[in-house]
Amino acid sequence: MYCTINGERLELPDCTVADLLAARGLTGKRLAVERNGQIVPKSQHGATHLQDGDVLEIVVAVGGG
């Protein structure tokens, strides 16, 4: 299946949001995931299966001052 992640169209295996984050080395990081214009709560990352054509934005929080 193909999904667009942060503006880049990628071919992905069947997976959940949690699987995608793990594959990208983002597990445990402070971040927000938007799927097709809707925020995916962290509690739903493991239950949210990606579908062909999904558009995701993954934003990682960066501390500093």
Residue ranges and their predicted role:
Residues 1-64:
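Ubiquitin-like/PB1-type beta-grasp interaction modules and other compact soluble beta-rich domains
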